[in-house]
């Protein structure tokens, strides 16, 4: 697999990570017990309410697993490589590295970060 394909996969994973964090945040802030409209209350069955709450719990668990998967990569690949991955493909800042290192060092570390992150992803999946 070449570098462009790896970068595309990393970008997709990080975009999904961002979506998952936003959805989980909105689920955590949502009111689980909204005000009751008694007409709706008597028309709906209790099983549909239970299904709704069960679905929310399962969705939260699934989102949490996916978020932890990406955040765990920081401890596996190291802070420096994780920082490179986030700056390049999550925040998409173009010239953030110019204050830290030379061009050759940046590209060498970027290549190593891509390979380390991709190896982590493929080892889990």
PLM feature segments, named:
Residues 76-92:
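Short amphipathic alpha helix immediately N-terminal
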Residues 1-75, 125:
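N-terminal interaction/assembly modules
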Residues 91-105:
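Helix-turn-helix DNA-binding module
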Residues 106-124:
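DNA major-groove recognition helices of helix-turn-helix
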């Amino acid at each position: 697999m070449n570098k462009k394909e790896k970068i595309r996969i990393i970008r997709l994973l990080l975009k999904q990570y961002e979506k998952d964090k936003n959805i989980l945040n909105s689920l955590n802030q949502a009111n689980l017990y909204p005000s009751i409209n008694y007409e709706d209350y008597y028309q709906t069955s209790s099983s549909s309410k239970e299904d709704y709450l069960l679905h929310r719990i399962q969705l939260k668990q699934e989102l949490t697993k996916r978020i932890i998967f990406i955040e765990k990569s920081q401890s596996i690949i190291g802070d420096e490589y994780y920082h490179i991955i986030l700056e390049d493909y999550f925040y998409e800042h173009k010239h953030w590295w110019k204050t830290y290192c030379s061009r050759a060092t940046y590209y060498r570390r970027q290549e190593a970060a891509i390979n380390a992150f991709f190896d982590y992803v493929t080892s889990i999946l």
